[in-house]
Regions:
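N-terminal, well-ordered alpha-helical segments
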Residues: 30, 34-35, 67, 91-94
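Active-site metal-binding core of divalent-cation-utilizing nuclease and nuclease-like domains
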Residues: 43-72
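Short, basic/polar, glycine-containing "phosphate-handling" surface segments that engage DNA
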Residues: 1-16, 59-65, 73-74, 80-205, ...
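Short alpha-helix boundary/capping elements
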Residues: 33-41, 203-216
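Extended, well-ordered alpha-helical scaffold/bundle regions in very large, multi-domain proteins
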Residues: 3, 215-220
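Acidic-basic catalytic patches of nuclease active cores, encompassing PD-(D/E)XK
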Residues: 14-52
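Central hydrophobic cores of alpha-helical transmembrane segments in multi-pass inner-membrane proteins
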Residues: 35-36, 75-77
């Protein structure tokens, strides 16, 4: 499958929905994923152990859920129909991930965009997004292939500890600056007023009104 074929089938190029665009979530989830695997030339579910559709998972509250696609130790994937809320989809797959041994990559897709969320232990989470209109761009396709072929490349270089230590250093620098200001021997005296231009008389003094207490006739 070529990028143009994929976009024409699953997208709406030029505002014209493709033949698979209107499929609901259940109808389109697996066929979209299989077409994506063919486009990217990556293994399809069932080709290796621990990689398949509909991975059963217990979620909070004792309910049972299913990750649409799961590759053990690599990713859990949740598919939605076009226009569905992908933030809600992420919360859904997060609720499965604990029971699925916390795969480091969580992917959500509404078939019009694919969002890759990383959750490597000890590292900050990062998000990458590829829209269907970008599926003909080699760098975007390479990014998606890395989910299967090089998942560790999504691990951020910085760790949570790096971020905490950097924040602590920044706070320490700020606190030291404030301490030095407080410890300085008083503020510098204000600058003298500018000299009066030559020939200008000094300002008149403010008049003072003296009030005398009235006195009655002198005692005789």
């Amino acid at each position: 499958m070529t990028p143009q074929d994929f976009i024409a089938k699953w997208g709406a190029p030029g505002g014209v929905p493709g033949p698979a665009h209107a499929l609901n979530e259940e109808q389109g989830a697996q066929s979209h994923f299989l077409d994506l695997c063919e486009l990217l030339d990556v293994p399809k579910p069932g080709s290796v152990e621990g990689y398949h559709f509909e991975e059963k998972s217990n979620v909070v509250g004792g309910r049972t859920g299913y990750a649409d696609v799961f590759m053990r130790g690599v990713f859990a994937w949740e598919n939605k129909a076009p226009g569905k809320n992908l933030d809600a989809a992420l919360r859904q797959v997060l609720s499965y991930s604990l029971a699925l041994s916390n795969p480091p990559i969580l992917v959500v897709s509404d078939r019009l965009s694919i969002r890759i969320h990383t959750q490597f232990t000890g590292h900050p989470s990062r998000t990458h997004e590829v829209r269907i209109a970008e599926m003909d761009q080699p760098d975007k396709l390479a990014l998606l292939r890395r989910i299967w072929l090089d998942p560790e490349s999504f691990k951020p270089r910085e760790t949570n500890r790096d971020i905490t230590e950097a924040a602590a250093r920044s706070f320490s620098t700020l606190a030291e600056g404030l301490r030095r200001r407080v410890a300085s021997p008083g503020d510098s005296p204000p600058p003298p007023p500018p000299p009066r231009p030559p020939g200008r008389p000094p300002p008149d003094p403010i008049p003072v009104l003296l009030l005398r207490r009235s006195r009655g006739p002198a005692a005789r």
